[in-house]
Amino acid sequence: MLRYALIFFIIAIIAAVLGFGGIAAGAAEIAKILFYIFVVIFLVTLVLGVARR
């Protein structure tokens, strides 16, 4: 589960770089939203993974 959160976090980072860099100006807002959603998912999964140990 932590692996999937990390994969989605990396995808969100790539989308954010493309969106914030002006390459896809129309998609910048979507990239921002996805970035924050996946940061939250990553942190929740990280906490759950540490709590299970």
Curated annotation (Swiss-Prot):
- Intracellular or extracellular location(s): Cell membrane
TM ranges: 5-25, 30-50
This protein's GO cellular component annotations are: plasma membrane
Keywords for this protein:
Cell membrane, Membrane, Transmembrane, Transmembrane helix
**Which InterPro entries does the record match to this protein?**
DUF1328 (IPR009760)
Question: Where is this protein primarily located?
Answer: membrane
Q: One Pfam family name from the record?
A: DUF1328
Task: Give coiled-coil spans as residue ranges.
Answer: none
> How does the record say this protein sits in the membrane?
Multi-pass membrane protein
Spell out the family assignment given in the record's similarity comment.
Belongs to the UPF0391 family.
Report what the protein is called: UPF0391 membrane protein BURPS668_A3117
